Each structure stands twice: as structure tokens, then as C-alpha cells.
Amino acid sequence: MLIFTTVNNPGIYHLFVYGSLRSGFKSPVYEYISRFFSFAGKAKVRGKMFDMGSYPAGMPTNDSHFIVGELYVANNPLEFSWAIGQLDDYEGVSVEPDEVQLYRREITEVYIDNKVVHAWIYWYNGDVSGRPLIASGDLIEYLNEKK
């Protein structure tokens, strides 16, 4: 799996989301995303997803596990830095010096329609020991099964 750990990489205007930022949640943050990004399609990335209670934790892997989510592309590349900065605040990437980042934003390979594109993703930055694995890799499917 190809991961770049730089925070800003010119030319990457795609965003992959797998949790509460997905369209199925209809959250205020999704409404924000839909203003600055256009839906490109359902997609997947190599990784494992864990149930942290009130939110999911995606962790990158090199094995055959996949996380199901959605790929978005910025409507206006000139607004991308500002828009992604707002999402960084929401995801706990932008923290004070004495705080720990809840998530980290990186570039990863996204599989969509038999193609591979590079996109930003928010990976969980904490410990998932003892947390349930979401085996399907699809948070919406997992939550529907729990009902």
C-alpha cells in the first residue's frame, strides 16, 4: 500500500470517507462535504475498521481486508486547502501542542470502478486493542445488522 505522510500534497484533490462523513449518515458534516466535494462513487481502501463505540476507527493494512466508503473530488481545487483544513478540525487532526491527534490525514490508494486513484483519508491514530473488528469493512452495513 502506498501512503504519503505529508499533510499537503498539491494535485491530490480526492477524499475517501468511511465513517460518519459518508452520505448515509446525513450529518451536518456531510452537508459541509457536499458543498465543497462531489461524489465520485462507492469505493474501497485496504484496511481494517474497528468499532470504537460512537465512531469507527480505520487502520491501514497490506493484507486482503478492505474498508468500504465513498470517494469525493473537490469542486474547486483552489478551495481545497481551506475545505480540508475544516475537516482536519472536525477529525481531531488539528490539535493543541498538549493534545493527541485522534486521526491523521494521509494519502492512500483507493479502488473505484477497476481503477486506482490516490486520495486523502483519515486513519485512526489510537489503540484499537480489544475493540470489535467490523469484518465487512462497511460501517453502514454493520450498523444496520446491529439494529
For each feature predicted by the language model, list its residue ranges:
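Glycine-aromatic micro-motifs
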Residues: L2-K147
